[in-house]
């Protein structure tokens, strides 16, 4: 009976506040598929507006060198999404025997094509081809992947011109945070990996959002502890 009487008492205000705060700090399940569907629908509508207002649609060229199964699958996924949204697309499949000079010449042809607004060179490229030289050959305004040196540099500059494009995986991570109203400013952020394609761009983007960023890599000590400090494990 004493227990029943206590349960009828008004709850302690401080205890309620503590419980509510803990509830607010709970992990959020981020559903990327739902966000992807939303973004796809938004892009479809924008493409239809472009078609109606300007009689044109965005054009994307994808350059695939060689026959790596993983690269081919990734390109197929991109083609399916491009077709779903309504883009104009061009696929350039080149043999892995192509020289660096020949590949750059093909990229420059796409630079000059007015129907192409974005160029994506699928990585990795075969041995013997300097990836940086090929990426620099892409016109910066057509750099769909955000790998051009000017776009990378602008991403790291504070207060400068924003990059015209950002690498897709880092951009997707930030988009998910924003769509779920997750604030980065003032928070400790741990990034696992320092690749030019994912890890380093995410570090730059999180820093630009005023996060305090720790980048862990193969030489980092106590990585698990650094992750636990952020509440991620």
Regions found by a protein language model. Give the residues of each.
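Short, well-structured alpha-helical segments in soluble
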Residues: 102-114
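Glycine-rich loop at the start of a catalytic domain that most often binds anionic cofactors/ligands
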Residues: 72-79, 105-107, 132-133
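Anion-binding alpha/beta catalytic cores of soluble intermediary-metabolism enzymes, centered on
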Residues: 30, 118-188
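Short beta-strand segments enriched in small/hydrophobic residues
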Residues: 57-66
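Non-catalytic terminal and connector segments of soluble metabolic enzymes
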Residues: 2-5, 84-86, 109-112, 138-141, ...
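Short beta-strand elements in bilobed, periplasmic/extracellular small-molecule ligand-binding domains
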Residues: 60, 82-96, 213-216
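Glycine-rich phosphate/diphosphate-binding loop of Rossmann-like nucleotide-binding domains
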Residues: 65-79, 161-233
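Positively charged, low-complexity intrinsically disordered leader regions
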Residues: 2-54
């Amino acid at each position: 009976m004493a227990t029943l009487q206590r349960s009828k008492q008004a709850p302690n205000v401080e205890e309620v506040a503590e419980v509510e705060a803990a509830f607010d700090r709970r992990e959020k399940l981020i559903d990327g598929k739902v966000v992807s569907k939303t973004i796809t629908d938004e892009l479809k509508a924008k493409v239809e507006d472009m078609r109606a207002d300007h009689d044109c649609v965005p054009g994307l060229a994808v350059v695939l060198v060689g026959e790596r199964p993983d690269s081919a699958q990734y390109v197929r996924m991109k083609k399916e999404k491009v077709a779903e949204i309504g883009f104009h697309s061009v696929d350039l499949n080149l043999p892995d025997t192509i020289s660096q000079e020949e590949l750059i010449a093909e990229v420059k042809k796409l630079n000059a094509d007015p129907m192409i607004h974005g160029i994506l060179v699928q990585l990795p490229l075969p041995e013997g081809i300097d990836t940086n030289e090929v990426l620099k050959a892409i016109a910066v305004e057509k750099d769909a992947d955000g790998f051009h040196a000017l776009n990378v540099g602008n991403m790291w500059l504070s207060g400068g011109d924003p990059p015209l494009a950002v690498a897709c995986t880092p951009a997707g991570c930030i988009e998910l945070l924003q769509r779920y109203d997750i604030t980065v400013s003032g928070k400790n952020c741990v990034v696992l990996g320092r690749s030019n394609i994912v890890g380093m761009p995410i570090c730059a983007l999180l820093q630009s959002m005023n996060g305090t960023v720790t980048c862990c890599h193969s030489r980092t000590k106590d990585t698990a502890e650094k992750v636990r400090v952020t509440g991620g494990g």
